[in-house]
């Protein structure tokens, strides 16, 4: 039987990652910068700030590192919408979920989608869970090919940087 407390910990970490992405977008900085600042405050003894869950930091850095690809993939699967027109919370939820679909090999795809839908229920509009589910359902159709292509590039002897 799965460790339900661990599942809850990951859920909270995802929710916090969505919060960081939302804050970062509002402030015009990256989610990784927000995460680093939060952890620096916690490390310096700020009483009211706890260190972030390591998974939250991993997600924030991952979304920051792969932002252009994640946004392109989301945009390609929006029907009748543009990324800029989406509510900011929905953008953050989708970015976390797409990062998990592409890069979190220990997270089954249905779990990433279910978690995103649950976060949309908790944090966004009544229409958002169905919308998020629909977009991620389409993204899930192409993630195996994207993961395979990324693995092939990493395995290629030519994938390293050239040295002078």
Swiss-Prot record:
One Pfam family cited in the UniProt record for this chain: NusB
Q: Which GO terms describe its molecular function?
A: RNA binding
Keywords of the record, alphabetical order, are:
RNA-binding, Transcription, Transcription antitermination, Transcription regulation
Give all cystine bridges in this chain: none
Single GO biological process annotation from the record: transcription antitermination
Q: Which GO terms describe its cellular component?
A: cytosol
Q: Which SUPFAM superfamilies match?
A: NusB-like
Q: Which InterPro entries match?
A: NusB-like_sf, NusB_fam, NusB_RsmB_TIM44
Cross-referenced PANTHER family: ANTITERMINATION NUSB DOMAIN-CONTAINING PROTEIN, N UTILIZATION SUBSTANCE PROTEIN B-RELATED
Give the NCBIfam families listed for this entry. nusB
Please explain the role this protein plays, according to its UniProt record: Involved in transcription antitermination. Required for transcription of ribosomal RNA (rRNA) genes. Binds specifically to the boxA antiterminator sequence of the ribosomal RNA (rrn) operons.
| Family designation | Belongs to the NusB family.
The protein's name is Transcription antitermination protein NusB
């Amino acid at each position: 039987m799965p460790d339900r407390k661990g599942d809850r910990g990951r859920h909270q970490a995802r929710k916090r990652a969505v919060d960081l992405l939302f804050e970062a977008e509002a402030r015009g900085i990256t989610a990784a910068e927000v995460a680093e600042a939060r952890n620096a405050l916690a490390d310096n003894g700020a009483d009211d700030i706890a260190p972030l869950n390591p998974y939250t930091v991993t997600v924030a850095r991952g979304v920051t590192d792969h932002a252009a690809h994640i946004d392109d993939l989301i945009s390609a699967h929006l029907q009748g919408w543009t990324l800029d027109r989406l509510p900011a919370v929905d953008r953050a939820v989708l970015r976390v979920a797409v990062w998990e679909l592409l890069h979190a090999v220990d997270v089954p795809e249905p779990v990433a989608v279910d978690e995103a839908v649950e976060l949309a229920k908790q944090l966004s509009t009544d229409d958002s869970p169905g919308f998020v589910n629909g977009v991620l359902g389409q993204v899930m159709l192409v993630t195996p090919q994207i993961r395979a292509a990324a693995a092939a590039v990493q395995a290629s002897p030519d994938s390293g940087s050239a040295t002078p």
